[in-house]
Amino acid sequence: MLKKVPSEIQILLSHFEWNLQRLDEVLKQEQSDYFKGAALQRFGHTYDMTLKVLRAFAESNNLPCQTDEQCFETAVNNGWMEKQSDWKEMAADYQRINQKPPQDAETVYGKLATFHNTFSQLFAKLKAI
């Protein structure tokens, strides 16, 4: 008997969930420079995976998702994310931590629990589709 091959979206969702779990784990660690750096790096990975998932969902529904902003707007417009979510701030903070040297790392670190919650809500809605 053949097993059902998971779709690209299912695979991306499982990777998204894995990244959420790792972000949650690192946020529960002590607040040393090492773990703060690890949390910021994990945030970057989770953000990237979020966009991959949004692009896959948008593509499968023939919806626009060319830029980060457009992907998040598509998610809001289709009820995948809350309208008041902090995605604009999240996108700006993602850009800040990816500058060399990273900008405002301590400030961004302080927002990661909120961003994790936003990612988790998005994951729950997408998984239910």
Model-predicted regions and their roles:
Residues 1-129:
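Solvent-exposed interaction patches of small proteins and small membrane subunits
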